Amino acid sequence: MNPKLLEILVCPVCKGQLEWKKSAHELVCPACRLAYPVRDDIPVMLPEEARAVGPDEVHGQA
């Protein structure tokens, strides 16, 4: 994930900062506990495409 892109992307639901989870190819919003998929290096920032994440995934290694 391009660090500059990560700086400007925010959660579409709460406008919070996102965390890049490289192993899962997802951008995670710790505030909403939603994970947005990254497909072919393109973040899919649609709430209907996000999945709920458990508390262990928010700041964990996922």
Curated annotation (Swiss-Prot):
Q: Which Pfam families match?
A: Trm112p (PF03966)
Q: InterPro entries per the record? A: Trm112-like
Q: What cellular component terms from Gene Ontology apply here?
A: cytosol
What family does the database annotate? Belongs to the UPF0434 family.
This chain belongs to the protein called UPF0434 protein Tbd_1506
